[in-house]
Amino acid sequence: IEKAYMKIHGGYDFPGSNSGIDLYALTGWIPEGFHMHDEKFQKHRTWQRLVNAHKYGDCLVTVATGQMPEEKADALGLVPTHAYAVLDVREACGVRMVLVKNPWAHMRWKGKYSPEDTKSWTVAMRRALRYDQLSAMQRDNGIFWIDYASMCEAFNGLYLNWNRDLFQHHTSHHRFWPANDHGPKNDSYNVGYNPQYTLTVQAPAAKDPSLPKSRSSSAVWLLLSRHVVNKRAESDTTPNQYLTLHVYKNKKRMFYPQKPYMSAPYSNNPHTLVRFDVPPGETLTYTIVVSQYEKEFDLSYTLDVFSMANFRLVPLSRTLGSEVRLDGKWSSSSGGGKVSSAGGSARHITFMNNPQFRLKLA
């Protein structure tokens, strides 16, 4: 498996990935990642999602450490820039606990609630988790319990891979976006030439009207995946391709990047996920805009739409309803009484000599 995975990524010198990307390549389950040290990370809400997902077996969970000094890593019992599997998620005696495994099958957590921690563990907690602390002390198999608060502090990345069968409706759209395409290199002021789509979602009515709308809404997930086309050429350029998706609540092509309804931060991760919900009983149309931070390289990508409700995805045409082209030129005065049509800026008295056109909208 490792050889096959490395081959499709161009060899063992590929730029690297994370456990969420790897699990998507191996299983096809939808990747979602969080930086637990980010100020926008919602610790409580994420815990609830972890508990619910683990209860039904619809999510693979992994965590990863970041860079850290060797002394700190030894003190914590962790491996820097290393991925760990999450085996269990539970709350015991009011403490949020996570069962983690080092895939090396040795080297484990030395902090709070480690096997050597005799102060934090209580008889009630050990009983609730069916944890034999004495046996754990005698054998280091890389498996350990850690409280959720310590996990969020000691680890950097949290990666969730969701079962795509959770969604009844799905479609994929593949596209090539050349770097020399029309439009500015930086789309901060104009996204009119970016690839765009209209997405119409028909959310069914709530089965139980007494439930709040948030519990009856239809989930819609958009996954933008960048293709690896030329492995050698992309080994240096890939980190510079920062992509995102912008979602607007309208039915037409966007030209100016106003504040979107939903969006994701620009990232050089090959997968970008945007999630939102459609209220029950409503049919809403959205415009989806694919964006690059700096359009320097050709981009081949896939846009996947996963939805609990029926939907229709249509690529937006760049062709406008009416188009007229007029040829003209700026010319300088060449004598003989001819007036220059290059009148300059509005600060010049000759400004009115610039070419002018009248536009009448019917």
Regions found by a protein language model. Give the residues of each.
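Accessory/interaction modules and long regulatory regions
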Residues: 1-362
